[in-house]
Amino acid sequence: MVKIEVGSVGDSFSVSSLKAYLSEFIATLLFVFAGVGSAVAFAKLTSDGALDPAGLVAIAIAHAFALFVGVSIAANISGGHLNPAVTLGLAIGGNITLITGFFYWIAQCLGSIVACLLLVFVTNGKSVPTHGVSAGLGAVEGVVMEIVVTFALVYTVYATAADPKKGSLGTIAPIAIGFIVGANILAAGPFSGGSMNPARSFGPAVVSGDLSQIWIYWVGPLVGGALAGLIYGDVFIGSYEAVETREIRV
């Protein structure tokens, strides 16, 4: 059963909530800077050459490490979402209210945009790569791929961080979350790019001015995240009472 709570504006503007938004902004900025920065660095080192297997592995590792750190540094303040799909998935399970979740989205997207602007500045105008489906694939395939890989990510978040029965698993949550993102980039990178994160795709799209495929990276991840929240929250957590987002330690 969906456990969505709307919440109140007052609670969403409390001191602790404002700190959570700032935490999401900073952590997402650092994650996107390192993740997108690894792709920019690859382009620099290869003179804008095509992505090869070694480059894919390097970019996947960079994203995995950066997300591990980002989740770790934000966990005790905001829950360490760094991703609108994660926020939506947790909202489906009643772990965060819709109003507060909406401001999380804003903070995450702003963090991504600022990270990309900083990358353009510090690289002397190098372009930031955007997500897009590969040649020969259609938008539908891209959306389905993003649904699957984002489902895996948010399911992992639930299992290791949000489930009240997690026990000692909570201590390895950031590692598990980083690992699943790295693995999914290796699997989906050559096809959809393996975004799993609307904010991660939104920043480069806005800064580059290429919004032609951005809808794929909102629809796919949000559907995947919502499905994971619905299935894990309803089937496996069941009658457990929902906890507040900042009580979820990853």
From Swiss-Prot:
A motif (NPA 1) lies at residues 83-85. The modification N-acetylmethionine is found at M1. Keywords: Acetylation, Membrane, Methylation, Repeat, Transmembrane, Transmembrane helix, Transport, Vacuole. GO terms for cellular component: central vacuole; plant-type vacuole membrane. A motif (NPA 2) lies at residues 197-199. It is a multi-pass membrane protein. Residues 46-54, 123-134, 190-217 are vacuolar. GO terms for molecular function: channel activity; methylammonium transmembrane transporter activity. Residues 1-24, 76-101, 156-168, 239-250 are cytoplasmic. Pfam families: MIP. PROSITE patterns: MIP. Its main location: membrane. It is found in: Vacuole membrane. The modification N6,N6-dimethyllysine is found at K3. The keyword Ribonucleoprotein does not apply. The keyword Transport applies. Widely expressed. The chain crosses the membrane at residues 25-45, 55-75, 102-122, 135-155, 169-189, 218-238. InterPro entries: Aquaporin-like (IPR023271), Aquaporin_transptr (IPR034294), MIP (IPR000425), MIP_CS (IPR022357). Induction: By ammonium nitrate in roots. Expressed in roots with a circadian rhythm showing an increase after onset of light, a peak approximately at midday and a decline to lowest levels before offset of light. Belongs to the MIP/aquaporin (TC 1.A.8) family. TIP (TC 1.A.8.10) subfamily. Aquaporins contain two tandem repeats each containing three membrane-spanning domains and a pore-forming loop with the signature motif Asn-Pro-Ala (NPA). Transports methylammonium or ammonium in yeast cells, preferentially at high medium pH. May participate in vacuolar compartmentation and detoxification of ammonium. PANTHER family: AQUAPORIN TIP2-3-RELATED, AQUAPORIN-8. Interacts with cucumber mosaic virus (CMV) Protein 1a. This is Aquaporin TIP2-3. The gene is TIP2-3.
